[in-house]
Structure formats: C-alpha cells, structure tokens
C-alpha cells in the first residue's frame, strides 16, 4: 500500500493540468457568441403578410454575420416571420411604422 501513494502523487500534476485545460475551454465556450448570431436569421422571407397581424418590426442591416438586409416581424400571436425587404408591401409597412414612430 505504501508503494501506491507515490504513483498517485506522480500523476497529480498531470491531472491538475488536465482539469485546468477542461475548465478553461468550457469557460471560453460559454462566453462565445451563439452560432445563430453568426449567420442570417431570415432564410426564407415571406413576401406578403397582413399588416394588421404585425406587432413590431426589427430591421437588421447587412454585416459580417449576413450579407443581406433582414426584416424580422413579430406577430401579435407571438410568432416571428421574416419579411422580404424588396417586397412593395413590406416597404409600405416599414414606411408606416417609421411615420408612426416619428409622430410620438
């Protein structure tokens, strides 16, 4: 039994190093941005949606995460829908919302 203790002590620094590596890697992964933030959110935009169903609209400009302008509408029932920014109906909805926000 006395011979087993020195073998365990010999591996203690290696186990400590391994533990520190695992903890350091998991902290870095927890602080990293989510993969969904690094790509386009709107893969299949909708060309038409009745404006009465829209509660709010968020516009995301092109950037390193996505090369296209994205229009994300939150509907009154809580769902989200991507709108085609080139569609005439979507442009009218955005203009109305901009006019409404300037009035307040």
From Swiss-Prot:
User: Where does the record place it?
Assistant: Secreted
User: Which residues are the signal sequence here?
Assistant: 1-31
Cellular component GO terms held in the UniProt record:
extracellular space
Q: Name one GO molecular function term.
A: growth factor activity
Q: Is the Cell inner membrane keyword given for this protein?
A: no
Task: Please give the InterPro entries that the UniProt record associates with this protein.
Answer: Chemokine_b/g/d, Chemokine_CXC, Chemokine_CXC_CS, Chemokine_IL8-like_dom, CXC_Chemokine_domain, Interleukin_8-like_sf
Q: Which domain of life is it from?
A: Eukaryota
Q: Name one GO biological process term.
A: immune response
Q: Which UniProt keywords apply?
A: Cytokine, Disulfide bond, Growth factor, Inflammatory response, Secreted, Signal
**Disulfide bridges in this chain:** 40-66, 42-82
Entry similarity comment: Belongs to the intercrine alpha (chemokine CxC) family.
Q: Which PANTHER family match?
A: GROWTH-REGULATED ALPHA PROTEIN, SMALL INDUCIBLE CYTOKINE A
Q: What does this protein do?
A: Has chemotactic activity for neutrophils.
Protein name (Swiss-Prot/TrEMBL): Growth-regulated alpha protein
**Whose protein is this, by species?**
Cavia porcellus (Guinea pig)
